[in-house]
Amino acid sequence: MKLFLLLLFLLHISHTFTASRPISEFRALLSLKTSLTGAGDDKNSPLSSWKVSTSFCTWIGVTCDVSRRHVTSLDLSGLNLSGTLSPDVSHLRLLQNLSLAENLISGPIPPEISSLSGLRHLNLSNNVFNGSFPDEISSGLVNLRVLDVYNNNLTGDLPVSVTNLTQLRHLHLGGNYFAGKIPPSYGSWPVIEYLAVSGNELVGKIPPEIGNLTTLRELYIGYYNAFEDGLPPEIGNLSELVRFDGANCGLTGEIPPEIGKLQKLDTLFLQVNVFSGPLTWELGTLSSLKSMDLSNNMFTGEIPASFAELKNLTLLNLFRNKLHGEIPEFIGDLPELEVLQLWENNFTGSIPQKLGENGKLNLVDLSSNKLTGTLPPNMCSGNKLETLITLGNFLFGSIPDSLGKCESLTRIRMGENFLNGSIPKGLFGLPKLTQVELQDNYLSGELPVAGGVSVNLGQISLSNNQLSGPLPPAIGNFTGVQKLLLDGNKFQGPIPSEVGKLQQLSKIDFSHNLFSGRIAPEISRCKLLTFVDLSRNELSGEIPNEITAMKILNYLNLSRNHLVGSIPGSISSMQSLTSLDFSYNNLSGLVPGTGQFSYFNYTSFLGNPDLCGPYLGPCKDGVAKGGHQSHSKGPLSASMKLLLVLGLLVCSIAFAVVAIIKARSLKKASESRAWRLTAFQRLDFTCDDVLDSLKEDNIIGKGGAGIVYKGVMPNGDLVAVKRLAAMSRGSSHDHGFNAEIQTLGRIRHRHIVRLLGFCSNHETNLLVYEYMPNGSLGEVLHGKKGGHLHWDTRYKIALEAAKGLCYLHHDCSPLIVHRDVKSNNILLDSNFEAHVADFGLAKFLQDSGTSECMSAIAGSYGYIAPEYAYTLKVDEKSDVYSFGVVLLELVTGRKPVGEFGDGVDIVQWVRKMTDSNKDSVLKVLDPRLSSIPIHEVTHVFYVAMLCVEEQAVERPTMREVVQILTEIPKLPPSKDQPMTESAPESELSPKSGVQSPPDLLNL
């Protein structure tokens, strides 16, 4: 019996010891693997090496101590893992480094991590962790040096408890949803060197206690935050500060003079704020400063003389302020200056003549000022100058010959000045040149194009000068040119057939010159042409039949020449041609009346005495003869008068009958307010089910047409219910209701939101749509998780939305104009497939070419086509413009308005930054796109710029947009031409060390 009791006692002790024994590190790692989806045992799994049969010290991402018994480092960064972080990670007792960055791990941060008392580095950045930051971490991780939770979904106030981490040197809390104020206790870390709270939703004042961080080297507080007031004077106490980024966070007032104490500062970014007053003199005492961006503020006054002491300055951005006075001569003496951007101010006087003599100048933009004088002669003395922009000033004199030898030059924009003399020889042969804009000057001489030209040149604009001589055949060597604008000059001689070699050409304008001879039929080889203007020349001969080979041509102007012969009837088949002008030539014969000719105005054919047809008079050969040409034009006969009287009487009776019927129907309607469901397909719910959704908590959107609710039907299906604004009885348009019902009720297309049915009680109308769980493109793209929307997904959305609009424009009869195309009206389903939505403003396009209600709204701000301002008319080309804005949003990641200064939208900004040159797309590319197929992005950008052309006739149709997007070039990877290129890191964003955010399709 005693032996039995002894055995029971030993068994109990053994069980107790086993139950209390901590989980082994081996099992902790297996638990971690189980919690992370995408980490299975298949060979393609990123954690496929984590097998029971092998030592965990050999597993990927695992580092052990010398005894190979304990894990000291776990680095699973960038493995595309999802799921949650298992609390069992806390059993890796000797862990010093934990990095799970650049994955898709969600859920809360487990507070159990606090038991890892030896942890020094914790990096959870670029995931989708949510909830509040656990305070337990701050009490347990006493040895923590690095804490990085950048770019997650963490909420609540900024954690105060992290100030207990006295060993902390690097803290990155940016890119989350933290709210509230920066706590004053954030000034108490004794050894911190890096602090980032940028990209949150912080408010209030910047606490003066921040000045106590005397060891701080980098401080990032900008972007999405909206602070009150300006910088506290205590900022000057940060004696070790090297980088300070306070851009775009609502700062006001003047820059405090105490900033001059920051003698180690090399980077100062305060752009896109509301700073005012003069530029602080003490800025010139920052002897270590290399980059200073104070652009997009409201600074006044002149550039301080103290700036002459900034001998290390490489970047000076003061554009978009209210500065005046002369540009000081010492700017040209700064020995390290590489970037100088002073555009959109009120600077006067001349450009410093020594500018560029330091041999390091890379970018100069002095446009939109009031500068006079001549151009500095040695701006490219170091052969590093890439961009030179001086447009919109009062500069005179010649263009320096040295620019014709500047092999580094990629863009030159000197339009809208008073420059004279000839274009420097060699300019068009520069190997990297992509854009030349010299329009609206007084340049003379011949076009200096020899055998060797720049094949990269995408745009040549020489309009409105005094250039003369023949157009050299070597112009055909500009194989990459997209826009060739030579209008308003004195060019003469024939148009060379070599123009047909310009396969990338989309716009050609040779109007207002002295060109003679026939129209070169070879021009038809330029398949991408959308705009051709050869008007006001001395051209002769016949219109070539080959012109019909240009399948996407929108605009063709051959007016005021000496063309003869008949108009080719084959032009009638050019469906894309929307504007044509053959007036004031010597054409003859009958104007075709079929196909596209039925859309052209008769004024397009005036001034051709031998042309005949409608409005032009009868043809000489008697084609128009018949027995219906002679009608009495005298006074009306008695019988005709009687018929008119009887007609009026009948109409009066008819109106009376209609009025009686209408009155009875209104009375009947007022007696019955029952809800009625009209279904466009089989539905498993009733109006009562729909009405149950109309609760405040279910609101998911509000717009001009009404409120949208999320509804759950009895069978579990999700729907979106749009409650339209109350309408007055008898309203002919019912606030968009009739238009939506007539269009959506019969539309079935994969990329258009499906209308399931509608409920009505004669006073209120409810539209029931299929539900789109991922919301709108605008919400996703412009939210803080827009970086997760990778390029492949963006391109897919662009093509799908284009197909939806194409269906409305080309496959509906009559065609449908959306009128409010925008990123918020492109909805995304669970697979991020795009669906065009919101037809509350859609109208049928009548045969007349105008919409049925021109007083209706024509779209949303930032998306409205420019012609609406003076025509008040909307057509399908207005939708094309709006879609082009959406494409620019996808490429740049920016909203259409609100980010570029007063009165500037995304189209104007992109044109300013790239000069509409597709090869400059990297200058505006969304910095959140870390790795992209550059040829695809360039092509989509090219399509976007076609869509937002100023003139509607120059825009492609949506069918052409789909075709061009579908035929996007696919370049094979090679050693010389990589498939992907890294997007340049934004100067405005702090470096986070993060390169590839996850794709939303994998969420």
From Swiss-Prot:
N-terminal signal peptide: 1-19
Deletion consequences: Rescues partially CLV3 disruption. When associated with BAM2 disruption, abnormal anthers at a very early stage and later lack of endothecium, middle and tapetum layers. Loss of stem cells at the shoot and flower meristems.
One GO term of the biological process aspect: floral organ development
Spans traversing the lipid bilayer: 641-661
Membrane topology: Single-pass type I membrane protein
Cellular compartments annotated: Cell membrane
Catalysed reactions listed for this entry: L-seryl-[protein] + ATP = O-phospho-L-seryl-[protein] + ADP + H(+); L-threonyl-[protein] + ATP = O-phospho-L-threonyl-[protein] + ADP + H(+)
Binding site residues for ATP: 700-708, 722
Ranges: LRR repeats: 68-92, 93-116, 117-140, 142-165, 166-191, 193-213, 215-238, 239-262, 263-285, 286-310, 312-334, 335-358, 359-382, 385-406, 407-430, 432-454, 455-480, 482-502, 503-526, 527-550, 551-574, 575-598
Tissue-wise expression: Expressed in seedlings, roots, leaves, inflorescences, flowers and siliques.
Keyword Repressor: no
Residues the record lists as Phosphothreonine modifications: 686, 871
Record topology, Extracellular segments: 20-640
Keywords (A to Z) from UniProt: ATP-binding, Cell membrane, Developmental protein, Differentiation, Glycoprotein, Kinase, Leucine-rich repeat, Membrane, Nucleotide-binding, Phosphoprotein, Receptor, Repeat, Serine/threonine-protein kinase, Signal, Transferase, Transmembrane, Transmembrane helix
Glycosylation site residues: 80, 97, 123, 130, 153, 164, 212, 237, 312, 346, 420, 477, 557, 586, 601
Positions of post-translational Phosphoserine modification: 855, 996
Residue numbers bearing the Phosphotyrosine modification: 769, 807, 863, 870
Cytoplasmic domain ranges by topology: 662-1003
Catalytic site: 820
InterPro entries registered for this protein in UniProt: Kinase-like_dom_sf, Leu-rich_rpt, Leu-rich_rpt_typical-subtyp, LRR_dom_sf, LRR_N_plant-typ, LRR_R13L4/SHOC2-like, Plant_RL_S/T_kinase, Prot_kinase_dom
Cellular component, GO annotation: plasma membrane
Family: Belongs to the protein kinase superfamily. Ser/Thr protein kinase family.
Subunit (UniProt): Self-interacts and interacts with BAM2 and CLV1. Binds to the CLV3, CLE5, CLE11, CLE18, CLE19, CLE22, CLE25, CLE26, CLE40, CLE41 and CLE42 mature peptides, probably via its extracellular leucine-rich repeat region.
PANTHER family in the record: LEUCINE RICH REPEAT FAMILY PROTEIN, EXPRESSED, LEUCINE-RICH REPEAT RECEPTOR-LIKE SERINE_THREONINE-PROTEIN KINASE BAM1
Function according to Swiss-Prot or TrEMBL: Necessary for male gametophyte development, as well as ovule specification and function. Involved in cell-cell communication process required during early anther development, and regulating cell division and differentiation to organize cell layers. Required for the development of high-ordered vascular strands within the leaf and a correlated control of leaf shape, size and symmetry. May regulate the CLV1-dependent CLV3-mediated signaling in meristems maintenance.
Protein's name according to its UniProt entry: Leucine-rich repeat receptor-like serine/threonine-protein kinase BAM1
Organism annotation: Arabidopsis thaliana (Mouse-ear cress)
Gene this protein is translated from: BAM1
